Amino acid sequence: MSDDYQGTLQQDKIPDEITMTTTNDSPDFTEWQNVLDLIRHASAEQRDELLFQVLLTHDEREALIARVNIVHELLNGERSQRKISELLGVGVATITRGSNELKHQDDDTKAWLANFLAQNKPNQ
């Protein structure tokens, strides 16, 4: 991005009361909780889709969709990891990573997540 474009972007798009100069040599957002807070605030303003479009590339958004489907399928327990891999067009190692993450969760969390995903499936 050219300096001229960046300057124009800052002047034209960001209100003066929001822009600030920082002399700190470290990033402003350093923890996962900071990102979660951003998402919550964007969602409250109904701008979460815009935030995700800016933060994630198309491929990253597709990977997130795949991860949601992986977790959903694993929690359903109706298909083998190999079948899930074939269904979603992802590698078995990707399914295994999702399975390993689920193993770190307690039963209440898994039950909540299974219910949450089942109740929030898009209408088809």
Residues of each region from the PLM?
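General nucleic-acid-binding
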Residues: M1-A42
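Short, Lys/Arg-enriched anionic-surface-contact patches
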Residues: D48-R67
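Short, amphipathic alpha-helical "recognition" segments used to contact nucleic acids or chromatin
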Residues: L64-R79
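Short alpha-helical "recognition helix" segments of helix-turn-helix
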Residues: R82-G89
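Short, solvent-exposed alpha-helical "recognition" segments
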Residues: S99-L113
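Intrinsically disordered, low-complexity basic tails/linkers immediately adjacent to helix-turn-helix/homeobox/MYB/SANT
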Residues: W112-Q124
